[in-house]
C-alpha cells in the first residue's frame, strides 16, 4: 500500500446541521469498505491526523474506509464558540459530515473529548452508529476515587489560557506514560499547531465558560446505548480516571473494557499496534 500522508488524504466538506450553516469541516480520508470515523481529543493543537496517524494505515489495510475528522474549532475546521456541551455539539457535526458524504452508518472511535462526542452520537443518533470504540472518554461526571478535575485537565486549561512551550511539555509529560516518546519533533509539531490557530484557544475557553465540563455528564443515559461497545483505558491515565471505565461497563449493556498497562491518556498512540489489533478484531468479530 502506498504510504498515507496528511496532505494526500486531506479533504474539506461543508455541513448543514443544527448550529452549523455552510460550516467547513476538514478531514483526512483513505480506504474502502465499512466507514470508521475517528474523533480526536480536546487538547490545544489537536486534530484528526495528529491523533490517529499511527492507526489509519492499519485500519485501511484491514479493509475499512477511515475518516479522521477535525472537530469544529480545531485544526483546519472552521472556528466556533459553543453554548451547549461540546460533546453534543460535536455529535451534530459528525451527523452533518455523514449526511454531506452520504454515509448512512459508521463505526465511531473516540478519544477523550472525541469519546464524549461518540457517546453523545450513540445517544442522539442510534440508527446511524455501528460499533462504538472509546478511549478514556470525557463526559462521565465525578470519580469515585480521584479528585476532579485531574492533573492533566488542569494543565490542559492552563495551556489554553497561557500557551507556552514549557506548559505544553508539562502537559505531554502527564499525557504519556513513556517519557521517551516526548521527542522534540512531537513537541514542535504540537506547538506549531497551537500557534497556527490562536482563535481556537480563545474560543475553547469562552465555550467552556458557557458550557462547563459539569454539563457534559451523560452517565444517567448510558443504559440507552445499544451499540456494541469496546472501551480502552490507560492504567496510568492522569486526565480521565480509570474508574470511569467501570462506570461505562456497568452502564452500557453490551460493553467490554481493556486496560493497557504502562499507558497514559493516548492509548491509540502510545500502544498503537496492540490497539489496532484489538479494535480491528472487535470490529470484525464482536
Curated annotation (Swiss-Prot):
It comes from the Bacteria. It catalyses: 2,6-dioxo-6-phenylhexa-3-enoate + H2O = 2-oxopent-4-enoate + benzoate + H(+). It holds the Pfam family Abhydrolase_1. Substrate binds at residues 42-43, 51, 111, 180, 190, 266. Its EC number is 3.7.1.8. GO terms for biological process: acylglycerol catabolic process; biphenyl catabolic process. Gene3D superfamilies: alpha/beta hydrolase. Keywords: Aromatic hydrocarbons catabolism, Hydrolase, Plasmid. GO terms for molecular function: 2,6-dioxo-6-phenylhexa-3-enoate hydrolase activity; 2-hydroxy-6-oxonona-2,4-dienedioate hydrolase activity; monoacylglycerol lipase activity. It is an enzyme of class 3 (hydrolase). Homodimer. This is 2-hydroxy-6-oxo-6-phenylhexa-2,4-dienoate hydrolase. It comes from Polaromonas naphthalenivorans (strain CJ2).
